[in-house]
Regions:
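Hydrophobic core segments of transmembrane alpha-helices in multi-pass, intramembrane catalytic enzymes
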Residues: 53-58, 134-138, 187-195, 238-242
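Membrane interface segments of multi-pass transport proteins and intramembrane proteases
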Residues: 32-40, 110-115, 157-165, 224
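Membrane-interface helix/loop boundary segments of multi-pass membrane proteins
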Residues: 145-170, 197-204
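Hydrophobic alpha-helical transmembrane segments of integral membrane proteins
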Residues: 85-103, 169-191
């Protein structure tokens, strides 16, 4: 039985990579070869194809998530509530603040400068630089798909054969590696750890999704906002580091109290 759960994370990540590339290929062929839309027009509106791809991925992985854990549907979980929704957003903002500090450091290290440049170029290319497309893909769709995959499927499978702390750490490292950029991998791993802690505590996928959403929202705003607004955003996310740390530490202490009862 444990061997089955050991294989699920590997197979789920492989399925995501394979399905993403296959869907993009099919959409591209459909648009260029069937509808005979020019490559330039396709590039200008390719974000609609990406949104469609993410919609399919959400459907596929949410269905897989439900099928895998259908027998555990009655497990205790924290209902959605304003306090935890706000707390999750604060954690996401705080993680973004730490990420900003890490990127500033990485920019000063010659060995990491190319990784920072590649990461920035990749962010600019999301949805062809279209604000609406970037919001729908990076801020809404990506957090849903990735949290279902890495917290709902990968992490939850690892709970079956590893201690909670080890499962959170390993799944978070996989989440970081998945981003294929050493600078991005570092802060994605940190975000994965905090999202994993909240999911382990609450057993409600909405909370890690909100952490991811808040982080990506700030990143998007920084990419589109003028420099004056960016300065205010930077101050805001730095201020959020302390309350974010408090919320995560409080969750860990509550876990310990629950274990001792």
């Amino acid at each position: 039985m444990k061997k089955r759960y050991f294989a699920i994370p590997i197979l789920a990540i492989a399925l995501h990579l394979l399905l993403s590339n296959l869907l993009y290929f099919l959409v591209e062929r459909l648009v260029l070869d069937v509808f005979h839309i020019s490559p330039q027009q396709f590039m200008n509106y390719s974000y609609w194809g990406e949104i469609l791809i993410y919609a399919v991925l959400i459907l596929v992985f949410f269905t897989l998530y439900k099928l895998l854990w259908r027998k555990e549907i009655s497990e205790p979980r924290t209902a959605t509530n304003f306090k935890d929704v706000l707390g999750s957003l604060v954690v996401g903002f705080g993680i973004c603040g730490i990420s900003g500090l890490w990127i500033m450091l990485a920019e000063q290290l010659p060995s990491l400068q190319k990784s920072v440049e590649a990461m920035n170029a990749g962010a600019e290319n999301i949805a062809g630089g279209n604000a609406f497309g970037t919001f729908m893909i990076a801020v809404i769709a990506a957090p849903v798909v990735e949290e279902i995959l890495f917290r709902g499927i990968v992490l939850r499978s690892m709970w079956k054969f590893a201690p909670a702390w080890a499962a959170i750490l390993i799944s978070s490292v996989l989440f970081g590696v998945y981003h294929l950029n050493i600078v991005q991998a570092a802060y994605a791993t940190l975000m994965g750890i905090t999202a994993g802690i909240l999911y382990e505590k609450k057993r409600n996928l909405l909370f890690p999704i909100l952490v991811h959403f808040a982080n990506n929202l700030i990143t998007m705003l920084q990419g589109f906002a003028p420099s004056e607004v960016n300065e205010l955003i930077s101050i805001f996310i730095l201020i959020m580091i302390a309350p974010a740390g408090y919320i995560v530490c409080r969750s860990l202490r509550q876990d310990k109290r629950a274990d001792s009862m």
